[in-house]
């Protein structure tokens, strides 16, 4: 981020900035005037919501931003997971985007990587046959993975 960025928050909303969790008590607009890593509360997913391959990847990447102390472990998990994930999808658009996401993470553009992963959810839903929210439904199995 090279320009300033204004973000409006609602009462009791949280924002994660460089690993700090900030909650506002009233409607506010904050202006980020330098390079920061941030994530809005509405974009945070919990572990139990990581129910598809791309949501699992999203969860791993979000840890890099929310928990800087655990970022190295999350990066290692990302590096191990990404090749398996690419191998598990036949959709060329998803695979190409995952390679771009790898570049973003490598360049420490975590917010952009999260945004790119979110944009793939509709493609993933189609690749999964529209059953990504059905517990126990078949999922792509990574090459070399075991049940």
Curated annotation (Swiss-Prot):
GO biological process: bacterial-type flagellum organization; mRNA catabolic process; negative regulation of bacterial-type flagellum assembly
GO molecular function: mRNA 5'-UTR binding
Keyword Lipid metabolism found: no
Superkingdom assignment: Bacteria
Sorted UniProt keywords: Bacterial flagellum biogenesis, Repressor, RNA-binding
Presence of keyword Repressor: yes
Pfam families with a match to the protein in the record: FlbT (PF07378)
Record-linked InterPro entries: Flagellum_FlbT (IPR009967)
NCBIfam families: PRK00794.1-1
Its biological purpose: Has a post-transcriptional repressor function in flagellum biogenesis. Associates with the 5'-UTR of fljK mRNA and promotes its degradation.
Family under the similarity heading: Belongs to the FlbT family.
Protein name: Probable flagellum biosynthesis repressor protein FlbT
């Amino acid at each position: 981020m090279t320009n300033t960025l204004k973000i409006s928050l609602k009462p009791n909303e949280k924002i994660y900035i460089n690993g700090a969790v900030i909650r506002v008590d009233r409607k506010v607009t904050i202006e980020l005037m330098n390079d920061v890593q941030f994530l809005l509360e509405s974009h945070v997913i919990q572990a139990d919501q990581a129910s598809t391959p791309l949501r699992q990847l999203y969860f791993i990447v979000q840890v890099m931003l929310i928990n800087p102390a655990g970022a190295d472990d999350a990066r290692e998990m990302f590096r191990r997971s990404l090749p398996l994930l690419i191998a598990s999808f036949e959709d060329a658009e998803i695979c190409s985007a995952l390679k771009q996401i790898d570049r973003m993470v490598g360049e420490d553009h975590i917010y952009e990587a999260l945004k790119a992963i979110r944009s793939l959810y509709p493609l993933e839903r189609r690749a999964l046959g529209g059953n990504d929210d059905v517990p126990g439904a078949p999922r792509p199995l990574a090459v070399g993975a075991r049940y």
